[in-house]
Regions:
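Conserved nucleotide-binding/hydrolysis micro-motifs of P-loop NTPases
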Residues: 66-71, 98-103, 130-133, 165, ...
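Short beta-alpha junctions and helix-cap segments that line functional grooves
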Residues: 49, 170, 174-178, 189-192, ...
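Conserved P-loop NTPase
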Residues: 2-4, 8-9, 111, 118-120, ...
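Pre-Walker A adenine-sensing motif
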Residues: 14-25, 256-267
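Scaffold/interface architecture of coatomer-like assemblies
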Residues: 23, 31, 36-38, 45, ...
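Short glycine-/polar-rich loops that comprise or flank the Walker A/P-loop
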Residues: 29, 56-59, 88-92, 161-163, ...
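P-loop NTPase motor core
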Residues: 32, 102, 107-183, 187, ...
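Conserved P-loop
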Residues: 37-101, 269-273, 279-342
Length: 495
């Protein structure tokens, strides 16, 4: 006899990013633990899921066993955007088990829960805090076996009632000898750590039966909207990017500087990533602004994450107009203690929302400083993952990187990430006849011919102007070029 495979329906939690790390949602009728230290966000997560899932056809019961009345808890939870007062006492009902717990009689506690569940027939049941049940049982003198039997009976009853259940508790370590961990189908562990003045919240799905969850710790943030989980960007096979990066007929995008497009071999190939590296004030942000402005002129949309100054400053009025009209999306980088996964998620969301073809990250140096200290340690690996994820969107990405002008050390990124990008443009300062001049060159364009010239360039009110290439000089990359004997200064042609 052939036994058909049982299909598990997955509930969409309503918590941004959580369904992704759960592997597609929460298994219906599962018996789950939401664990963590005090203040880690357990009750907020439970309420956000409850209000997101509860409907008239799928009602929820929330049992509180805390010493404080539900009204006090609701006073704080209703400050969040997800709180829906119209659902209270209709699709969402609260019950206080404090009196039942005080006796330490688990039979009475189970009887009370059973009676309310039978009366209201909920699809969702929450018990907060379940650790209070454990402490009350121990203080009441009952045996550890009694607690284990209570948990097993509760799990069996919830399954027979076809209710998806959540036990919320203050647990500090997964290896505690606690019977509830064995019975649970799923465990969502919330953590928070403090390093210097930085507070970082992380979530881990330590257990979820029947689900291929995303392993590891995932950062999340609590705002007025509630909890937002930032799953690591997924490197899917399907993307809008050009799948054949070696194709000789690549579609090209203009950077907004015609001469620089020529140096690139006709523009930047669509879907490529470009690193613009140079010292402070060399014109990196201006080039980034020209890239976005040119896209706007051609009817394209873009996204910018500016970490050093507001996007509408130093990039001209055209950028401000594009932002105000909604054709350029701006990533808010003012939040403290960000993670690379958070910024990547915000970028990808904006790219999909606007169907953006151009993305600017200005700059990687500011990007690193915006991160919580714990995330700076693996910045290179996280950045590599983010660049790969952005490539799957099909957008063309321009990143800037500030370098110290060390002329004895030719580097294009302080993070050793230059190899991750498809193309590199370098900007440098040189001294000629006691004057500071700017030069630029295209270092690489993957699978494409490009100019090898070092070209002078100026910056005026209209942006970047590429001048002639430097001929008759030696030691340009050393910062102090010397003119070959008998050759005049070619830059004098523009004087």
């Amino acid at each position: 006899m052939t036994i058909g495979k049982a299909l598990i329906h997955r509930l969409q939690t309503g918590v941004p990013g959580l369904d992704e790390i759960l592997g597609g949602g929460l298994p219906e009728y599962s018996f789950n633990i939401i664990a963590g230290s005090p203040g880690s966000g357990k009750t907020t997560l439970a309420h956000q899921m409850m209000f997101g899932l509860a409907t008239a056809q799928r009602p929820a019961l929330y049992f509180t066993v805390l010493g404080e009345p539900p009204l006090k808890m609701l006073r704080y939870q209703q400050q969040f955007d997800f709180f829906d007062s119209e659902k209270v006492n209709h699709s969402v009902r609260f019950f206080n088990l404090s009196d039942d717990i005080a006796s330490g009689d688990l039979v009475q506690v189970l009887k009370r829960i059973s009676s309310e569940v039978e009366r209201h027939n909920p699809a969702l049941v929450f018990i907060d805090s379940f650790r209070s049940v454990i402490l009350a049982e121990r203080s009441g003198g009952n045996s550890f076996l009694g607690l284990q039997q209570f948990i097993q009976q509760l799990g069996t009853l919830m399954t027979s009632w076809q209710a998806t259940t959540f036990l919320i508790g203050e647990y500090f370590a997964e290896n505690d000898p606690n019977p509830v961990f064995t019975v649970a189908d799923g465990m969502i562990w919330l953590r928070q750590s403090v390093e210097r003045n930085s507070v970082v919240r992380k979530m881990e799905i330590t257990k979820m039966r029947g689900a291929a969850t995303l392993a590891g710790l995932h950062t999340f943030r609590i705002t007025s909207a509630g909890i937002h989980v930032f799953a690591p960007p997924q490197l899917g096979a399907d993307s809008g990017a050009d799948s054949d990066s070696t194709s000789p007929a690549l579609t090209r995008l203009s950077l907004g500087v015609p001469e620089l497009d020529e140096m690139l071999g006709g523009g930047l190939p669509r879907g490529y990533s470009l690193l613009v590296a140079g010292p402070s004030g060399s014109g990196k942000s201006i080039l980034a602004g020209a890239f976005l402005t040119e896209g706007g002129r051609r009817g394209e949309t873009g996204v910018i994450a500016a970490f050093e100054q507001r996007p509408n400053r130093s990039r001209g009025g055209a950028i401000t107009e594009l932002i105000d009209s909604g054709r350029i999306g701006v990533i808010d980088t003012r939040a403290l203690n960000m993670s690379v996964d958070e910024i990547a998620a915000l970028l990808i969301r904006e790219i999909h929302r606007l169907k953006a073809s151009r993305v600017v990250i200005d700059s990687l140096s500011g990007f690193e400083l915006a991160l919580a200290p714990t995330f700076r340690e693996d910045f290179r690996e996280s950045l590599a993952r983010m660049i790969s994820a952005l490539a799957t969107t099909g957008a063309t990405v321009l990143m800037t990187s500030e370098l110290e002008d060390r002329y004895a050390d030719l580097r294009f990124s302080p993070y050793g990430t230059a190899f991750l990008t498809d193309s590199i443009i370098v900007q440098r300062y040189i001294e000629v006849d006691s004057q500071l001049k700017r030069v630029t060159a295209v270092v690489k364009v993957r699978a494409s011919n490009h100019s090898n010239d070092l070209r002078l360039f100026d910056i005026d009110d209209d942006g970047i102007k590429i001048r002639q290439k430097l001929v008759g000089f030696e030691g340009l990359l050393g910062g102090r070029p010397t003119r070959r004997r008998g050759l005049r200064d070619p830059s004098a042609d523009d004087a």
